[in-house]
Structure formats: structure tokens, C-alpha cells
Amino acid sequence: MKRRHLLASVCAAIALASGPALAQDKVTLKFGWTSSNGEKDPYGVGARIFKAKVEEYTKGSIEVQLYPNRAIGDERQMIEGMRFGTVDAGIITNAVIAQIEPAFQVNDMPFLYADEAKAHKVLDGKVGAELANRLAKKGVISLGWMEGGFRNMINNSKPVAAPDDVKGVKYRVMQNPVYIDMFSSLGGAAVPMAWGETFTAVQQGAVDGLEIPVAIVEANKYYEITKYLSMTNHTYSMIGLLISKRS
């Protein structure tokens, strides 16, 4: 689907989700995410385009207020807030979506997608539609899937050129059984941790490293506190553009 048609569909979905209030008053949507609002941060790029197009297509009747850097909570807090109507919308990593709808765990399986094109084909097809339907039953509407890129290992211990290189290294992982099992099975020490705690944990040596897309390494300055980046491309990072049913 072309971007213009997709965004038009998104705006229509928001209008329906916003209900009768749209006809009476200007609607304000608080839109959050946990990483930066940097020029190259994929979350920030997506959020800014979303804001611009929603306000354009609704002729200003919907205002999108942006809250980067965990301003309205970590991802788990945000998605739970969407379920209960205390958070309007945001960008949430697949692994965190899986905490409320376990079917999403399939996307985090290591080496499941060979490249972005194959991931797009699956997520834009029947599988993505079924995942969205399941999530809607939990009170959260998927407006679409965004590109997070492939995840890579970054640490202060050693480069990763083979599976054995993960042994004995403490990696911060997302609070998701797929990631915990992945690193544990390789002999690493998997340390589940919220994103907001991670930079300080790496900086202070509580963990040796983590695994994130290269764009997030750059946008959040992880290159300043780590020594080794290994292009493992072990998991495709799907991120969801989500809105509360109650918004």
C-alpha cells in the first residue's frame, strides 16, 4: 500500500476511534515513545511524520502532541495505559506488545526473516492482520507496523563472530521470554530490564551490553559507552504504531 493511502486510512481509523468528540471539539492525542526525537531515530522519524500527516489530513481537528524519551512512561506502562484509556497512542516494540498478546512473540524468533522485504510481506498480509485483530481484543488498535531494522549485539566485553562469543557476557534483554531464552541458550547471562534503566546499567557495568538496531545505537549515543558493535542481525525489530480504543 502506498504511503499516502496508508496515512489516509490511519487518519480515518483515528477519526473513528475518537468518536463523537471529533465533530464538537478539537481532539488532542498524546503520542509517546521511549527513544529520542533525533533526526535518525526510527521512532522519532515515524512520530514526526505521523503528527504532520494526521494534522494535515484532519485539517487541524486532531492535534498530535509528541512525548519522546519516556515522557509518559516506559513501553509496558504506555501499552497498559492504552488498554485502559490513560494513554492515547504511541510506538511500541514488538517484544513489549507480546507481553499483552503472546501471539506477537513469533516476530521475535531469531533469524525468522531473511530481510526487510520478507518481513513486510508477512506483516502486511494475513499474519499481520490476524495479529492486529488479536491486539484489538485487548483494547489496543494497530494503525500499522513500522520499520525498526535488524537488531545487533553491542557490548564492552568482546566482538561476536560466532555463537560461542555470547558465552559469559551479560546482555540486557527485553522482558520477553523469546529474548531471555535466546541469550540463555547461547550461554550468555540474559538480564531482563526496562529501556529506561539500560543506558545507566551499561554505563555503570551492571550489564556488559545489549542488542538493538544500529539506528538506536546512534540516536541514543550508545557508541559513547560501549566498545564493540557486532552486526549479528539476529532479530527483525518490528515496532507497532498503536492507539487506544478509548481515545
Regions found by a protein language model. Give the residues of each.
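N-terminal secretory/targeting leader peptides
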Residues: 4, 8-11, 24-118, 126-127, ...
